[in-house]
Amino acid sequence: MAENFWKRNGLDQASKEEDILYCIVKEMDSIADNDYLKDRERLGDFYKANQEQLMELSAAYGELIIREIGGKWAEDEDWRMKHRISFLEEVPAIGRVALPVNLIQYWENGGSRRLLWEYQEYKWAFGEWKRLCRLAGIETQADTAGKL
């Protein structure tokens, strides 16, 4: 699902975190229109017009979370392309991340600023979780996978 996003931006899953975030933010902001928030009917039309791009952004964002924090998709890609209720599961320190629902809510309520805030919250929670596990002497998958 994220393949179009990667191609469109000259990226791949191994690209730098900041490059991926920059392109997600740039695309999200390019389809944002503050006027649509005042009119729910228009919001629905605007969503339908941009649904495919939002799903691609969601897939790229999910892949970034999996790479940087951990977790896995709950459903296969074919299923995810047709449903808004997909999610990441087993994300360390977080549990579930509802994508693309979360990304669509970020787009509706603050756009890229909201997405970046939530992403830094995930990163902080993951870092704090690793620190506390170390203090407690608990080895995590992040330790054994070299993510420290």
Where are these regions (language model features)?
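Alpha-helical protein-protein interaction elements
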Residues: 28, 38-39, 53, 65, ...
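Amphipathic protein-protein interaction modules
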Residues: 48-109
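Intrinsically disordered, low-complexity N-terminal regions enriched in serine/proline/glycine
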Residues: 35, 46, 60, 118-121
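Charged/polar, solvent-exposed surface patches and flexible loops
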Residues: 4, 22-26, 30-34, 67, ...
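A recognition module on extended beta-rich or small alphabeta surfaces enriched in W/G with H and D/E
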Residues: 85-148
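Residues at alpha-helix termini
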Residues: 9, 68-69, 136
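N-terminal low-complexity, intrinsically disordered segments
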Residues: 1-53
